[in-house]
């Protein structure tokens, strides 16, 4: 009888432990503010951090963050070492293998061709030839991939979004690619005559979260939480903390 009681206690303890397993999120080490601030290899603030924190809290789960190089994020997801990747687009992971659920789009990322104040004339990306373009190591730029493959343009990879803009600022190259949020954050304390300028829109990409389908992960509950965050205006309120906007209308999310 005592053995049966002990077995029951152990089973209950195992069930509680399973329910309390943390929700494991990936953080790309190349990200920068306002997306995320990383201190001592852990995120501490930023748009994506706030979204993930709220997502886990509403699911009554603790959040665990794995900071990894962007090139390894997909592999980490496929291996089951993380449960959720936020700030993701299907076009960035065309060869993803496994069973996953995608959220509705939460934000619209606008990628810009960026230059310095002395070279701020609007420029069609297709007109660029024999240019070195500042890029982030491991980032995919679908609209410019043919130009890179054909060597019409050359990548100059830096390890983070901030480093790309810093190298542009000191004229290591004439053009770089960055998103509107990172550009605005980088420029926020610069005098007007020193602010980097967007000279063309490269791409506009809906981004959301992807959750690994596993019996231990409440994927559908997480999808409902993200939908509620979007429709209630919580995503927009998070964006406003960082003086920016999601790019999606608050009352009518874009289709997945």
Give the predicted meaning of each segment.
Residues 30, 42-54, 116-150, 156, ...:
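Bilobed "Venus flytrap"/periplasmic-binding protein-like clamshell domains
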Residues 19-98, 135, 157-158, 222, ...:
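Extracytoplasmic small-molecule ligand-binding "clamshell" domains
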Residues 65-127, 137, 141, 198-201:
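Acidic, polar ligand-binding/catalytic clefts
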Residues 62-69, 152-167, 199:
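Short beta-strand-to-loop elements that line the ligand-binding cleft
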Residues 62, 140-155, 159, 227-256:
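Ligand-binding clefts/hinges and TM-proximal coupling segments of bilobed small-molecule sensing domains
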Residues 29-31, 107-112, 188-227, 246-256:
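Periplasmic-binding protein-like
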């Amino acid at each position: 009888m005592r053995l049966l009681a002990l077995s029951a206690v152990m089973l209950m303890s195992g069930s509680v432990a399973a329910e309390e397993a943390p929700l494991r999120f990936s953080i790309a080490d190349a990200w920068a503010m306002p997306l995320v601030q990383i201190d001592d290899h852990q995120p501490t603030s930023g748009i994506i951090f706030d979204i993930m924190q709220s997502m886990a809290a509403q699911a009554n789960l603790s959040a665990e963050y794995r900071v990894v190089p962007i090139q390894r994020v997909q592999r980490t997801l496929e291996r089951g070492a993380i449960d959720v990747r936020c700030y993701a687009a299907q076009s960035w992971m065309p060869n993803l293998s496994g069973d996953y659920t995608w959220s509705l789009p939460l934000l619209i990322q606008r990628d810009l061709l960026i230059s310095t104040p002395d070279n701020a004339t609007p420029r069609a990306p297709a007109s660029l030839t024999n240019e070195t373009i500042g890029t982030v190591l491991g980032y995919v730029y679908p609209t410019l991939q043919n130009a890179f493959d054909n060597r019409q343009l050359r990548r100059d990879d830096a390890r983070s979004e901030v480093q790309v803009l810093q190298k542009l600022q000191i004229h290591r190259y004439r053009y770089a690619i960055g998103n509107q949020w990172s550009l605005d954050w980088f420029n926020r304390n610069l005098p007007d005559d020193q602010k980097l300028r967007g000279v063309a829109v490269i791409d506009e990409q809906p981004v959301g979260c992807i959750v690994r389908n596993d019996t231990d992960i409440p994927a559908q509950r997480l999808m409902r939480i993200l939908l509620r965050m979007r429709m209630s205006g919580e995503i927009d309120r998070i964006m406003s903390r960082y003086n920016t906007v999601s790019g999606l209308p608050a009352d009518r999310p874009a289709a997945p």
